[in-house]
């Protein structure tokens, strides 16, 4: 079945061993790293208007525990801010919208919300009524490459590991015969194909910024976190290695006769890892936002590998950990193109290849975090 973004782009559902819920530690670690940026943006968004109801949206929320960690973090930031400014008797109501494509596991998300609400009530039972701001949480299915909110209605947008995904499967990329069998950018890929990846990101991110500008209130803030790259050279990105090893694993299944070569020739990952320069250039070109903060930091491929050294202590275990994380993200896309029957074998082979790679080179994700504010446009 051909890949369709709105249907197939979602994390692995449920609570099983290969689910996103069980394999989202990388995202958790990144959320911890961006806390200062999120706090600054949240305080600025609230301080701009001191709204009685503050609307916050998480775009590409998925359905794991990190979604509610974000909600909890924002609640805590607003509570601290109000206490510091002697407004604890005048908390805003917090309205959270958790947005993702319709294929997202919203059933699991709603169960998590129910548990979260019960936990909040239990933890603050008997405390003063003003202990925390009241919050209301809703799910919102739909593509963030369309308008999803009324004009000037949102105070804070947040998106973690979502805006680097394409809005749609590029027909030009699908129709290009990929004789190298690469699924992401490599040095062997024709320059025309590389350009298609870049152009799709530029088109999508420009549209995303224009849509969010319409939906943000004056003084509204946005914090976006991408898997990016450290260097401007498109061929030197860390993602090239990560996805290149997946391509090699798929090629090995072609050699074994388990995957049709024609299917791999027409398959690519609808994703792009941008550089700081590319992101800054698009923000400036669109001209609707002021840039507060942009930086790149690194985090180990292995979500459980916290050492800062250059060596991987257990490459086999690390390979398995990396494979579980990538499977939780890529499983629906891969299954839609090649079938579910190849998944176990594919990611076992991928784990082996990652382990071999890590024996020679400890590779890290380059994480790009961007904080921007809605600009005042004088007509």
Swiss-Prot record:
Residues 1-21 are annotated as: Disordered. Residues 1-10 have a biased composition (Basic and acidic residues). S-adenosyl-L-homocysteine binds at residues 20, 61, 66, 100-101, 143-144. GO terms for biological process: defense response; methylation. Anthranilate binds at residues 27, 164-165. It comes from the Eukaryota. Mg(2+) binds at residues 265, 267. Its EC number is 2.1.1.277, 2.1.1.273, 2.1.1.274. Induction: Up-regulated by herbivory and jasmonic acid, but not by salicylic acid. It catalyses: anthranilate + S-adenosyl-L-methionine = O-methyl anthranilate + S-adenosyl-L-homocysteine; benzoate + S-adenosyl-L-methionine = methyl benzoate + S-adenosyl-L-homocysteine; salicylate + S-adenosyl-L-methionine = methyl salicylate + S-adenosyl-L-homocysteine. Gene3D superfamilies: Methyltransferase, alpha-helical capping domain (1.10.1200.270), Vaccinia Virus protein VP39 (3.40.50.150). It holds the Pfam family Methyltransf_7. Keywords: Magnesium, Metal-binding, Methyltransferase, Plant defense, S-adenosyl-L-methionine, Transferase. It is an enzyme of class 2 (transferase). Belongs to the methyltransferase superfamily. Type-7 methyltransferase family. SABATH subfamily. Methyltransferase involved in the biosynthesis of methyl anthranilate in response to stresses. Utilizes anthranilic acid as substrate. Produces exclusively the O-methyl ester. Can also use benzoic acid as substrate. Low activity with salicylic acid. PANTHER family: S-ADENOSYL-L-METHIONINE:CARBOXYL METHYLTRANSFERASE FAMILY PROTEIN (PTHR31009). This is Anthranilate O-methyltransferase 3. It comes from Zea mays (Maize). The gene is AAMT3.
